[in-house]
């Protein structure tokens, strides 16, 4: 059995590639705005840091490879990689982490394989996973949404936190993570998993401030809905196809519904899975990467469904609260196999 991987991305010229990448950046604006609203200025600062790092790293590698720097940077792929990594990490993560993660994504996960169209794994998720495994504490230190935060840093304090780790008054991440109830806060998925391990019931957990009056966690449901709006825009513009996001979301919802039906005391509800963490970001902006996803319609359905199952398994039984990045990379591994068995039959061709 021989695997044949067609050259990608599956667009015919640089102008078309640039247009699609730019549309994805535009579609990300609602999600970026929502994250900035609920979690502060850090999201924007991380995007700027990641974008600069991505462009500089790409330019350096292209120069070393004696390729045209200007023409390659104009496809916006490096910019998009930096953006996706930046919105995936905590807004007050140290500056060197986003630089390290973005540099690794561009230099190792993308350019080392030959550049755009040759990388088998999503570069942004490679960078994210490297950071998560190397610095788990910093990568899970999300601020509580402003609605339930005891202290919210302003623009200058946000910059100080990113570059020095302290606010002007000497506050640190431990202080800023405290909610209005006086308890250090985490993301809804992280809170759910940690509290279950501590012996709390689902009924008790859902009374925590992070879930107060919300379907899937204060702030997080609106962030996910904002990414959903961007995803619908991409579908409307035909920048992505529906197969991957629909199969991913339906499979995740089905797994979550079945799990919740049979074990409501230990497993999260479908709405928590769908509207928390990086669900919508992953469905429309990460899994749909034309370079690392399946290239056939049937293959896209299988690819999305596989990622949905993996996200549910990792969230429900794994060691990490959110499993989107790991699910994406594991699904990327299967793409050659999926494409091999879902490639349309060529009429008139017979195996000799």
Swiss-Prot record:
Bilayer topology term: Multi-pass membrane protein
Superkingdom assignment: Bacteria
GO biological process: electron transport chain; transmembrane transport
Name of one Pfam family that matches: NQR2_RnfD_RnfE
Gene Ontology CC annotation, any one: plasma membrane
Membrane-spanning residues: 20-40, 42-62, 69-91, 123-143, 215-235, 242-262, 267-287, 301-321, 322-342
Stated family: Belongs to the NqrB/RnfD family.
Cross-referenced NCBIfam families: PRK00816.1, rnfD
Oligomeric form and interacting partners: The complex is composed of six subunits: RsxA, RsxB, RsxC, RsxD, RsxE and RsxG.
Name under which the protein is recorded: Ion-translocating oxidoreductase complex subunit D
Organism lineage: Bacteria, Pseudomonadati, Pseudomonadota, Gammaproteobacteria, Enterobacterales
Gene name of the encoded protein: rsxD
């Amino acid at each position: 059995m021989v695997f044949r991987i067609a050259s990608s991305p599956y667009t015919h010229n640089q102008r078309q590639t640039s247009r699609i990448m730019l549309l994805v950046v535009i579609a990300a604006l609602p999600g970026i705005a929502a994250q900035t609203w609920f979690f502060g200025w850090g999201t924007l600062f991380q995007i700027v840091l990641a974008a600069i790092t991505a462009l500089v790293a790409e330019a350096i590698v292209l120069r070393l490879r004696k390729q045209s720097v200007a023409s390659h940077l104009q496809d916006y792929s490096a910019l998009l990689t930096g953006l996706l990594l930046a919105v995936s990490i905590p807004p007050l993560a140290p500056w060197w982490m986003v630089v390290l993660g973005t540099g690794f994504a561009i230099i190792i996960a993308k350019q080392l394989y030959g550049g755009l169209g040759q990388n088998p794994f999503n570069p942004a998720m490679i960078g994210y996973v490297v950071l998560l495994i190397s610095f788990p504490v910093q990568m899970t230190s999300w601020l509580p949404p402003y609605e339930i935060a005891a202290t919210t840093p302003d623009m200058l304090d946000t910059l100080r936190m990113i570059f020095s780790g302290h606010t002007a008054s000497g506050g640190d991440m431990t202080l800023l993570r405290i909610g209005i109830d006086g308890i250090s806060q985490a993301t809804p998925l992280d809170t759910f998993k940690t509290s279950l391990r501590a012996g709390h019931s689902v009924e008790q957990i859902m009374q925590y401030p992070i879930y107060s009056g919300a379907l899937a966690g204060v702030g997080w449901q609106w962030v996910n809905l904002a990414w959903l709006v961007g995803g619908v825009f991409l579908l409307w513009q035909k920048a992505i196809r529906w197969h991957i996001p629909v199969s991913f979301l339906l499979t995740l919802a089905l797994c979550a519904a079945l799990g919740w039906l049979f074990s409501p005391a230990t497993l999260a509800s479908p709405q928590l899975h769908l509207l928390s963490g990086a669900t919508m970001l992953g469905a429309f902006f990460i899994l749909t990467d034309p370079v690392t996803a399946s290239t056939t319609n049937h293959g896209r359905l299988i690819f999305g469904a596989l990622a949905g199952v993996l996200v549910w398994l990792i969230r429900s039984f794994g060691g990490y609260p959110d499993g989107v990045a790991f699910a994406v990379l594991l699904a990327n591994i299967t793409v050659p196999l999926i494409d091999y068995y879902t490639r349309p039959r060529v009429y008139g061709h017979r195996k000799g």
